[in-house]
Amino acid sequence: MKRRDFSLAGGVALAAGALVLPAARAQTTTPAQVQGKAPQAGEDYLALDKRVPVDAPAGKIEVIEFFWYSCPHCNTFEPALDAWIKRAPKDLAVRRVPVAFRDDFVPQQRLFYALEAMGLVDQLHRKVFAAIHVERQDLARADAIAAWVAKQGVDKAKFLEHYNSFSVATKATRGTQLQNAYKVEGVPALGVAGRFYTDGTLAKNMDRALQIVDFLAAGIRSGR
């Protein structure tokens, strides 16, 4: 989903997860097409004009997934991303960063970082997507989010303590700063090593975007 689509969408569409993906992102690419042409800078991925600081330890290649819980395409991408993470080389450090293209995205940013602070991302991350896109629940506001989290067996008071904390607010702000530093134009999107950016529009689809990340990581290992 492109940034301009978020700007044009109304509150009803946001809650329903009914925003439309640009045609370019929905296109498919066959394995033969991927193998027949090496990814090209400026076409399949972007090299950032200014490097972005990374959080990965020395010797690790940081890969960031930018996402939004209410984005249907992020929901669709999750199984493929999870499978890719499981088979990724050990030198890749993968982390998720929720975006905030508008102020009303911030509650879901805080949701993710509160779950992270409580060690509940592995347990509840996919369930958040399911609640929004399968059960059609509106988790766009703090009260609805807290009520849903409580139904998952999480102490509501402790969750809200994290949700409203300075540390979670700071992480949300830094997430938005990181999104802007990478010049994220839509989600899902992938940032690599503070140097490269790709998404479904550039790569033609997100499966190929992951292949491009593999290509870029290989280049970093070889000193390119």
State where each predicted segment sits:
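Extracytoplasmic/secreted proteins, especially bacterial periplasmic and envelope-associated proteins
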Residues: 62-65, 76, 80-83, 106-110, ...
